């Protein structure tokens, strides 16, 4: 009901359907965050998950959002059509509220998630924060050559400090995505079903 399919009830219902039909494999398109053109095969990261797939009903159940906050957004009028421009605005508006409520509350779990994914998560979160800072333009068009080309430790730390709120946001969204994805994957395994995803063409 909120613009795009998610890792929520519909996914579990489909898993049950596969199980009832005697199927043991669910093949999916890449699950990474999409870039310009919204193709799942062109992603900002090989490792990150797409925040669009975070289920908002589960966030309501978890106390991170209210139903009024979710239903007040414009998700489009055609349930068969994904309006990526619209859900970009609407999703990040409500996901920001979820982060504002959950970042401190979930800090112990988030810290463990960060440690487990330290090889890619800090760079991804900083890259996305910088991309937002520079108007979502391609990194080749960023105004600051120091972050665009040289990426010295000092410059990276400068931008981590400057963009701390957005770095936290993109970190927390990955935490939420993988918490929901891992629960769905565990449910699939309980049904003796495995999921396969295609590889993406990463840009980071």
What annotation goes with each model-predicted range?
Residues 27-37, 199:
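Short, solvent-exposed turn/loop segments enriched in Gly/Ser/Thr/Pro and often Arg
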Residues 1-9:
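Mature N-terminal, pre-catalytic/accessory segment of carbohydrate-active enzymes
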Residues 197-203:
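Conserved small/polar residues in nucleotide/adenosyl-binding loops
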Residues 5, 35, 40-47:
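Short secondary-structure boundary/capping segments
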Residues 10-31:
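Catalytic domains of carbohydrate-active enzymes, especially glycoside hydrolases
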Residues 1, 30-32, 131:
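Short, flexible loop/turn elements at secondary-structure junctions
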Residues 43-65:
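Acidic, His- and aromatic-enriched active-site or binding-groove loops in soluble protein domains
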Residues 66-192, 196:
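Active-site-proximal, well-structured secondary-structure segments within enzyme catalytic domains
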């Amino acid at each position: 009901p909120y613009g795009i399919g998610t890792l929520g009830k519909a996914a579990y219902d489909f898993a049950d359907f596969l199980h009832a039909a005697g199927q043991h494999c669910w093949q999916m398109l890449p699950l990474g965050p999409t870039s310009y053109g919204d193709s799942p095969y062109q992603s900002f990261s090989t490792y990150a998950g797409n925040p669009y797939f975070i289920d908002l009903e589960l966030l309501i159940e978890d106390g991170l959002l209210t139903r009024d906050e979710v239903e007040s957004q414009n998700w489009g009028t055609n349930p068969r059509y994904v309006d990526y421009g619209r859900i970009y605005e609407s999703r990040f508006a409500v996901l920001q509220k979820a982060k504002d409520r959950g970042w401190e509350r979930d800090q112990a779990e988030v810290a463990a998630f960060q440690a487990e994914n330290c090889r890619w998560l800090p760079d991804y979160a900083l890259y996305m924060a910088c991309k937002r800072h520079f108007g979502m333009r391609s990194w080749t068009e960023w105004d600051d050559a120091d972050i665009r080309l040289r990426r010295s430790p000092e410059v990276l730390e400068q931008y981590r400090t400057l963009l701390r709120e957005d770095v936290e946001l993109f970190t927390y969204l990955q935490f939420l995505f993988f918490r929901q994805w891992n629960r769905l994957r565990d449910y699939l395994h309980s049904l003796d079903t495995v999921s396969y995803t295609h590889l993406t063409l990463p840009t980071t």
